[in-house]
């Protein structure tokens, strides 16, 4: 009798309405908090060059040993970042990553940040090792795919301060040679006065 009573319970519940909820619930997903630690992103400068300089500090800071970086030197013919070096190989193993954010704190150029995207489930273990192409931020309007020369500023200081080349309008200060150039001239005058006083 025991086996037949089990079949009876199964037969009764077969036609009941299911209470299982699908995941994710379409239209009911809550927005993630802005400071949530999701997947990583390699950022770009406004002209499209990569911010990563291949210093490997993120890999050294990672407690799970999930990051692999291989740096290389930029050349005048092939420039991927504004500095001397760039990250030629950049991989994050999400099977090991604990999303702690220590790599973000270690990055000196703010090249590495974390997004709110956390849905990275997949059926293959190999797909959890994200490469540089998958981690790089998409090109926005006005950006150019590297390699290419620096498009901002006359020298490295101007580039990292976001100043345009001489003769071009600075979107922050107005017409050419008014804001940023005037500021540079003031700095030079102050420096010359200090040198004369010494």
UniProtKB/Swiss-Prot annotation:
Residues 182-198 have a biased composition (Basic and acidic residues). It is found in: Cell membrane. Its main location: membrane. [4Fe-4S] cluster 2 binds at residues 62, 97, 100, 103. Residues 137-198 are annotated as: Disordered. Its EC number is 7.1.1.-. Belongs to the complex I 23 kDa subunit family. Gene3D superfamilies: 3.30.70.3270. NDH-1 is composed of 14 different subunits. Subunits NuoA, H, J, K, L, M, N constitute the membrane sector of the complex. SUPFAM superfamilies: 4Fe-4S ferredoxins. It is a peripheral membrane protein. [4Fe-4S] cluster 1 binds at residues 52, 55, 58, 107. It catalyses: a quinone + NADH + 5 H(+)(in) = a quinol + NAD(+) + 4 H(+)(out). One of its GO terms (cellular component) is plasma membrane. Keywords: 4Fe-4S, Cell membrane, Iron, Iron-sulfur, Membrane, Metal-binding, NAD, Quinone, Repeat, Translocase, Ubiquinone. InterPro entries: 4Fe4S_Fe-S-bd (IPR017896), 4Fe4S_Fe_S_CS (IPR017900), NADH_quinone_OxRdtase_chainI (IPR010226). Its cofactor is [4Fe-4S] cluster. It comes from Cutibacterium acnes (strain DSM 16379 / KPA171202). NDH-1 shuttles electrons from NADH, via FMN and iron-sulfur (Fe-S) centers, to quinones in the respiratory chain. The immediate electron acceptor for the enzyme in this species is believed to be ubiquinone. Couples the redox reaction to proton translocation (for every two electrons transferred, four hydrogen ions are translocated across the cytoplasmic membrane), and thus conserves the redox energy in a proton gradient. One of its GO terms (molecular function) is NADH:ubiquinone reductase (non-electrogenic) activity. This is NADH-quinone oxidoreductase subunit I. GO terms for biological process: aerobic respiration. It is an enzyme of class 7 (translocase). Binds 2 [4Fe-4S] clusters per subunit. It comes from the Bacteria. Residues 42-72, 88-117 form the 4Fe-4S ferredoxin-type domain.
């Amino acid at each position: 009798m025991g086996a037949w009573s089990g079949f009876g319970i199964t037969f009764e519940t077969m036609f009941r309405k299911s209470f299982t909820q699908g995941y994710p619930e379409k239209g009911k997903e809550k927005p993630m908090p802005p400071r949530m630690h999701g997947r990583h992103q390699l950022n770009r400068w406004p002209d499209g060059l990569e911010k990563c300089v291949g210093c490997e500090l993120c890999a050294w800071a990672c407690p799970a040993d999930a990051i692999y970086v291989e740096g290389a030197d930029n050349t005048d013919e092939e420039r991927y970042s504004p500095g001397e070096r760039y990250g030629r190989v950049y991989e994050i193993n999400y099977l090991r990553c604990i999303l702690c954010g220590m790599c973000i704190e270690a990055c000196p150029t703010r090249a590495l940040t974390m997004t709110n995207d956390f849905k990275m489930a997949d059926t293959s273990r190999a797909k959890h090792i994200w490469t540089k192409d998958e981690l790089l931020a998409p090109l926005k309007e006005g950006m150019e795919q590297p390699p290419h020369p620096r498009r901002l500023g006359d020298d490295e200081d101007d580039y990292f301060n976001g100043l345009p080349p001489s003769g071009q309008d600075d979107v922050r200060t107005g017409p050419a040679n008014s804001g940023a150039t005037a500021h540079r001239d003031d700095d030079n005058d102050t420096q010359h006065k200090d040198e004369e006083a010494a």
